[in-house]
Swiss-Prot record:
It comes from the Bacteria. The active site is at R20, N38. This is Acylphosphatase. The gene is acyP. The keyword Transcription does not apply. It catalyses: an acyl phosphate + H2O = a carboxylate + phosphate + H(+). Belongs to the acylphosphatase family. Residues 5-91 form the Acylphosphatase-like domain. Keywords: Hydrolase. It holds the Pfam family Acylphosphatase. One of its GO terms (molecular function) is acylphosphatase activity. It comes from Moorella thermoacetica (strain ATCC 39073 / JCM 9320). The keyword Hydrolase applies. InterPro entries: Acylphosphatase, Acylphosphatase-like_dom, Acylphosphatase-like_dom_sf, Acylphosphatase_CS. Disulfide bonds: none annotated.
Amino acid sequence: MSLVRAHFLVKGFVQGVGFRYFVLRQAAALQLNGWVRNRYNGSVEGVVEGPEAEVKEFLDRCRRGPAWAEVKEVKVQYEEPRGETTFRIRSSV
């Protein structure tokens, strides 16, 4: 099983609509680790680590977002896995 790490940035109407909690639930459902946080520019940033197939599914779910969000763009940069052990919501930056 190949582990991957994806650093993602979601743009659109994604703050104030529970997007971070949506991301947290998707990561838990797919048994992935990492973090998510709001950025002061209105985007949502995060990192997810796990098996490649599950990470791809997670990113697809982020592109769809919850019903009340409006996702305009998801940028993804793959990095070397760093051994994240949980998935958490971080403070905004």
